Amino acid sequence: MHPTAARTGVLLINLGTPEAPTPKAVRRYLREFLSDPRVVEIPRVLWWPILNLVVLRTRSRKSAHAYRTIWTERGSPLLAYTQDLRDRLAADGRFAAVEIAMRYGNPSVRLKLEELRNRVETIVVLPLYPQYSAATTGSAFDAVCDTLKTWRHIPSLHFIGDYHRSPKYLEAVAASIRSFWQEHGRPERLVFSFHGLPKCCIDRGDPYASQCQATAQGIARLLELSDDEWLLTYQSRFGRAEWLRPYCIDTLRELPSQGIRHVDVVCPGFAVDCLETLEEIAIANRNEFLGAGGKNYRYIPALNASPAHADILIGLLEPYLALTA
């Protein structure tokens, strides 16, 4: 048993998921997600008609089909893995309460903060985004503040902004890759794929790209990879604006013509597997690579609810125990 900070609670925040793989549920989820000004930095008066008259009409059905390909008996993989990860942290016994919330969809940040409100005196908020971006971590902070500003008594609050260079995080991802290679063999190239971001966000000061680079370099160093054995890419581009390059899908289409026909793809920016990894990376991008002449394409799963992942989060949260002991 570990010493417990009886007054300290933890709120893990993940992005979110529709409640069902149906056009109606996906449309509701996308409306909330894409209405966040942190996510789409376009004036509302211009974005509202585009979102409601074009985007939601065209993407809801297509996205619902993609969700159906990865849906499980427990529902959304993202929610199920996050719940399992929460259970591992709770079982460790160091915190009085551990809850999860989704930035978009359910369970909401407001609901889970209200549940923690009367149970603890200190709340540690940990968004499950290793690399900081205003569109993810910043938005999670907004959601927390939107709730707290309605409370008369606000508990002590600690907010963890990123953990892109956490030694435990880097080593856990590297260890998962080593284990995968021990079982399946090594590829000709390891492709790191992080969620993309409009380049204008970086130009305005978002540290996301530099943190992705630091993470990939740190993992490659632990794996003792030479510069020509790995590369960094970005996925999930949305809209017509320029996003961070190189684009993952374009890279995968080009590699076979360069003589690279065996690749492994890993996505260290995703704490748990979700639509973007299980459908976009593991299925759609695989088809693109094989269609371009590739021979062997493998996706290395996220850390999900593994003991190593729980250990990372405990390491990030543990310093706050001393503050309330």
UniProtKB/Swiss-Prot annotation:
InterPro entries xrefs: Ferrochelatase, Ferrochelatase_AS, Ferrochelatase_C, Ferrochelatase_N
SUPFAM superfamilies named among the record's database cross-references: Chelatase
Keywords tagged on the record: Cytoplasm, Heme biosynthesis, Iron, Lyase, Metal-binding, Porphyrin biosynthesis
Binding site for Fe cation: 195, 276
UniProt GO cellular component terms: cytoplasm
Pfam families linked to this entry: Ferrochelatase
EC number: 4.98.1.1
Xref: PROSITE patterns: FERROCHELATASE
Compartment(s): Cytoplasm
GO biological process, one term: heme biosynthetic process
General function of this protein: Catalyzes the ferrous insertion into protoporphyrin IX.
PANTHER family: FERROCHELATASE, FERROCHELATASE, MITOCHONDRIAL
Similarity-based family: Belongs to the ferrochelatase family.
Protein name: Ferrochelatase
Organism encoding this protein: Methylococcus capsulatus (strain ATCC 33009 / NCIMB 11132 / Bath)
Originating gene: hemH
